Amino acid sequence: MKVCVIGNGGREHAIAWRLSISPSVEKVYAVPGSAAMKNCAELVGIDWSHMDHLIRFLKDNKVDLVVVGPEAPLVAGLADALHEAGIPVFGPSKAAAQLEGSKVFAKDLMKKYNIPTAAYGVFSNVDEAKQFIAKTGAPIVVKADGLAAGKGVVVAMTVEEANAAVDDMLSGNRFGEAGSTVVIEEFMAGEEASLLAFVDGKTVVPMIASQDHKRIFDGDKGPNTGGMGTYAPAPVLTDVLRDEAMKTILEPMVAAMAKEGMPYVGCLYAGLMITNEGPKVVEFNARFGDPETQVVLPLLEGDLGQIMMACATGTLQPNMVKWKDSSAACVILASKGYPETSSKGDVILGELVQYDTSIIFHSGTKLEGDHYVTNGGRVLGVVGLGKDLRTALDRTYERVDHITFKGMQYRKDIGAKAFK
């Protein structure tokens, strides 16, 4: 079959690469894709927001399935437009994508269906928000309601820091409309894990658990980012805890969405905190994680094209999804100034080819002449594969040592928590 991937980041590079080696897939298109994706997909210079134009292309080229990578097209209703045109799509409707598009929607739904998460309040008035902070005390978490590219969360260790975050968001300075309402929630102690699942509206099949590293600096210091590295499988989410998360979180949420008249199709991403009381929801995302995808998909043994088509058509079977008994690690190489700013146009030196034991996914690069240059905050995702996590990490950092660009920054402690 022919599959079209929407997006141009590291996550989409990983999806297109994995689809290109799936037996059921004969051709992959990428809209718009990136120069680095040329070896696994045909690039199509269409803006997804011109939906009529996109649908015409898909029909003219007899594309069988569309896979939506980023959150913005989902929240804008791309899946709905494709449904109306009769094109199968892996990705939730606009209504279902609110699970990520609105923190308030997600928290209220969890409360209604008793899905374990942190206690919270919702505010659009600065004074009321600050009263809640004063009453609750720190540490406390302040989140922008809308989409903020993974950066709309402040874990405040003091009341002053929380108040500053509220001022910043509710003033409209920081995230504009996305921050005009905030969710303030209790701080949950524990270790985080990401559990992604394939969903066809009713059936939920979990992927291998991974662990993301959100903060920019080693030791989980500095501001939050879209993610600085991941590894899988994550030992913190044992089989017992994963089963518990499925029974108390993912399956009830998918059932709740169906009951609310917005069945969920695609990848459901549960960001979990493993607390003393068991797994609780930190956040839901309505798509594959970035960079979780870069470690999860290389460990998949099933046919990704077949699995995604089954999700899109309501025919998902648990036995379609199998995992390799090995590990993967990803280290993100970011540009100078990230996450506040990003330096573009710096030449990337080093080997960017793919090996059996390591892959490089391009998050923010551009081809100029015969070399790649930086073109975003997160530039490359360097992935190492191995029989165990130590081997995978060694291979990852070995590759990192042979790549350089001006102002390159990366974390040297990805995966360290797995060895504690």
Name each region found by the language model.
Residues 156-293:
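Internal nucleotide-binding/catalytic subdomain
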Residues 21, 36-38, 60, 90, ...:
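Solvent-exposed alpha-helices and their adjacent loops that cap or buttress functional pockets
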Residues 4-5, 100-181, 211, 235-251:
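Active-site nucleotide/adenylate-binding loops and adjacent lid/helix of ATP-dependent enzymes
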Residues 30, 67-68, 89-92, 119-122, ...:
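General beta-strand structural signal in soluble alpha/beta enzymes
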Residues 1-95:
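ATP-binding N-terminal substructure of ATP-dependent carboxylate-amine bond-forming enzymes
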Residues 310-420:
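Peripheral (often C-terminal) accessory segments that flank ATP-dependent C-N-forming ligase machineries
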Residues 246-268, 285-355:
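Active-site "cap" helix and flanking loop/linker of ATP-utilizing ligase/carboxylase catalytic domains
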